[in-house]
């Protein structure tokens, strides 16, 4: 049985967000943070930038370029003590030493508050929500619609009433608004600040879940900008370590701390897409080159590139550029094994091979 503890610990060496009344902000130590693009930036983007995304309308072409391999819970298995599959965008299903969890579960056709506008999904998830294996817990990085899908959160909880949700500060109230973690519910929601951790116990094994700094922002409605914190996550088992960055700009000092204090990581899930134009996206989304630096700084043995090839995100890079650029850059690195940071096809199983 899974039995989350209520104890938590804090590492003061990690950066802390700035709290301004009801809202959060990135700290001044995040020197690459240039702020959230404003209205004038939006007009400049709309009228001066050319969209090079060019996603084909032909499904047959997409099936070749970005294959989706349909799987069920029965297919999600391995002899390895660490394996994972990419379910599209930032959703990664992981089995780490027998505990199963998912990052930012999103199944929506549109990453939006409405079904007729907003970022449209052009590659389907390889696994239906009802085909997920039994989950022990889930981590949510922030409240943007491409990372927090209310329908998926509720359906996962309905199927896994004992699941534990780990969320950054301010998000517990949102979860309770969905009926999750309220009085009388067997589902637990643990809200953490950057540098805080909580323990999860299953079958006598203890797993430590860390909430980690990320350079980003949050908003779901017109009047709730930055009311809920954003974060990355680390899951530490007895022998295996996993890191998920969430959406982030490049705050290299923090990434180095993650590697020194919690690494080396056996597997990391790092975003590589939605990064052009740089003047607009750099503060909030790393590009493939910066993703490789994150991979190195956190001392990841293996990383999977995510946050690409799923939704029309509004960025202007060619839709396959994140994958192709990552491979090109990794092939050119002499200090890193070129297979240590790769992309995988949706539904394919990645497994640690260093048993």
Curated annotation (Swiss-Prot):
Zn(2+) 1 binds at residues 142, 144, 216, 247. It catalyses: an N-acyl-1,2-diacyl-sn-glycero-3-phosphoethanolamine + H2O = an N-acylethanolamine + a 1,2-diacyl-sn-glycero-3-phosphate + H(+); 1,2-dihexadecanoyl-sn-glycero-3-phospho-(N-hexadecanoyl)-ethanolamine + H2O = 1,2-dihexadecanoyl-sn-glycero-3-phosphate + N-hexadecanoylethanolamine + H(+); N-(5Z,8Z,11Z,14Z-eicosatetraenoyl)-1,2-di-(9Z-octadecenoyl)-sn-glycero-3-phosphoethanolamine + H2O = N-(5Z,8Z,11Z,14Z-eicosatetraenoyl)-ethanolamine + 1,2-di-(9Z-octadecenoyl)-sn-glycero-3-phosphate + H(+). GO terms for cellular component: cytoplasm; neuron projection; neuronal cell body. It comes from the Eukaryota. Pfam families: Lactamase_B_2. Zn(2+) 2 binds at residues 146-147, 247, 307. An N-acyl-1,2-diacyl-sn-glycero-3-phosphoethanolamine binds at residues 145, 285. PANTHER family: N-ACYL-PHOSPHATIDYLETHANOLAMINE-HYDROLYZING PHOSPHOLIPASE D. This is N-acyl-phosphatidylethanolamine-hydrolyzing phospholipase D 2. It comes from Caenorhabditis elegans.
């Amino acid at each position: 049985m899974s039995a989350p503890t209520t104890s938590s610990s804090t590492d003061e060496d990690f950066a802390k967000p700035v709290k301004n009344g009801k809202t959060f902000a990135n700290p001044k130590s995040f020197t690459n943070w240039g702020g959230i693009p404003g209205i004038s930036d939006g007009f400049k983007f709309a009228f001066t930038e050319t969209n090079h995304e060019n996603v084909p309308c032909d499904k047959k072409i997409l099936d070749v370029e970005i294959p989706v391999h349909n799987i069920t819970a029965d297919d999600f298995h391995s002899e390895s003590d660490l394996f994972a599959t990419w379910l599209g965008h930032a959703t990664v299903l992981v089995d780490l030493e027998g505990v199963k969890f998912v990052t930012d579960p999103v199944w929506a056709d549109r990453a939006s508050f409405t079904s007729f506008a907003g970022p449209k999904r052009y590659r389907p998830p390889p696994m239906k929500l009802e085909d997920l294996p039994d989950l022990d817990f889930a981590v949510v990085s922030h409240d943007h619609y491409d990372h927090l899908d209310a329908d998926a959160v509720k359906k996962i909880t309905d199927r896994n009433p004992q699941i534990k949700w780990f969320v950054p500060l301010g998000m517990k109230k949102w979860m309770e608004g969905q009926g999750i973690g309220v009085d009388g519910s067997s589902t637990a929601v643990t809200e953490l600040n950057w540098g805080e951790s909580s323990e999860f116990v299953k079958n006598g094994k203890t797993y430590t879940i860390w909430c980690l700094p990320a350079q980003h922002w949050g908003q779901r409605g017109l009047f709730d900008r930055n009311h809920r914190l954003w974060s990355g996550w680390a899951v530490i088992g007895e022998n295996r370590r996993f890191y998920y960055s969430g959406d982030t700009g490049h705050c290299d000092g923090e990434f180095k701390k993650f590697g020194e204090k919690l690494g080396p990581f056996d597997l990391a899930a790092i975003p590589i897409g939605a990064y052009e134009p740089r003047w607009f996206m750099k503060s909030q989304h790393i590009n493939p080159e910066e993703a490789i630096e994150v991979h190195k700084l956190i001392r990841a043995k293996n990383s999977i590139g995510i946050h690409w090839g799923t939704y029309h995100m509004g960025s202007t890079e060619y839709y396959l550029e994140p994958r192709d650029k990552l491979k090109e850059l990794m092939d050119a690195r002499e200090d890193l094994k070129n297979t240590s940071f790769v992309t995988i096809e949706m539904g394919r199983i990645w497994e640690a091979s260093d048993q």
